[in-house]
Amino acid sequence: MLHTIVNCPTCAKQVIWDPVSKYRPFCSERCQLIDLGEWANEEKRIASVEDEAMHYTFENND
């Protein structure tokens, strides 16, 4: 049986994408919590069209 292998988004360790991998796509609870903390601290965000438009406006107001 072939398994899909992904890299943990936090530490890049290889993880089997399977229900047996409890924290997938993370390799461990630690990496999962590090990622959650980054989202909570607003170090990560999903870009939107509005974000890009605001960036363009601010750049051109110099």
Curated annotation (Swiss-Prot):
Q: How is the cofactor bound?
A: Binds 1 zinc ion.
Single Gene Ontology MF annotation:
zinc ion binding
Identify the Pfam families for this entry: YacG
Name the source's superkingdom. Answer: Bacteria
UniProt GO BP = regulation of DNA-templated transcription
Which co-factors does it depend on? Zn(2+)
Q: Which InterPro entries does the record associate with it?
A: DNA_gyrase_inhibitor_YacG, Znf_NHR/GATA
Gene3D superfamilies associated with the record: Erythroid Transcription Factor GATA-1, subunit A
Report keywords, A-Z: Metal-binding, Zinc
Which residues does the record give as Zn(2+) binding sites? 8, 11, 27, 31
Write down the NCBIfam families for this protein, in alphabetical order: PRK00418.1
Subunit structure, interactors included: Interacts with GyrB.
Function comment:
Inhibits all the catalytic activities of DNA gyrase by preventing its interaction with DNA. Acts by binding directly to the C-terminal domain of GyrB, which probably disrupts DNA binding by the gyrase.
Q: Which family does it belong to?
A: Belongs to the DNA gyrase inhibitor YacG family.
Question: What protein name is recorded for this chain?
Answer: DNA gyrase inhibitor YacG
